[in-house]
Amino acid sequence: MTYRSRAQLDAGLADVVHSPLDQGRLALIVRRPASGVREVLAEAVLDPTLGLVGDNWSVRPSSQTPDRSPHPDMQLNVMNARVAALVAGPPTPLGDKTAGDRAVGVYAVGNGPMADHLPIDRRTLAGDQLYLDLDLSEANLPAGTRLYLGSAIIEVTAQPHTGCGKFSARYGVDALRFVNSTSGRRLRLRGLNARVIVGGTVRVGDVVAKVG
C-alpha cells in the first residue's frame, strides 16, 4: 500500500476548505462493535447515554477520566468526509493489505462472512463514527455548537481529537503530520469530539445543519 505524500495531501486541502459552512451532509456512518471491527451502516440510532447505539464507546475504558469510565465529551468521533477520502485513497483489495490493515481487521460493509470478500474502505480505518461533508474548523464550529443531524441533535465538545500512532500506521507519517500541523488542528482535519443532546435516528445523506 502506498500512502499519500505530503504534497498530495496539501494539494487536496483546497477541496477540504470548501466544505459547506452549514447545510452539510452525513456521508458515512461507521459503528465499532468491538476493538478493531468496523460496521458501515446506512442508518444508526444516537442516544444521549449510549452515544451511537451498538458502538463500543459506552463500554470502552477511558484514560482521561478518573475512574476510567467512558468520557462523556468523547461519545462521538466526527471527521470531515473530504479529509477521510483524501488520506485514505481508493479501497484496498484484501490481497494488498498493509500491516496496519491486518492489525485492525477492518471490513468494508458489516462484520459477517461476506465481508471477507469485500475490498477495504480505508476511510473506516480512521476509527470515527460520523463522517460529515461540513467545515469542522474551530472557527465554524466552536465548542458548544449544536448540530441537527437526522432527528438527533449533537453538540461539539472542547475535548481535542488529534492523530496518534494508529493514524500514522494506517495512513502514513505524512498524513499524521498533515492533520496535526498548526493549520490542521485549526481546521480540525483529524476531526472533533461531540456528544448526543437529543437522541434520534441518523441516515447517510441526512442534512447536517447548525441549531439556531
PLM regions: where:
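Metal-cofactor-dependent catalytic cores
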Residues: 1-212
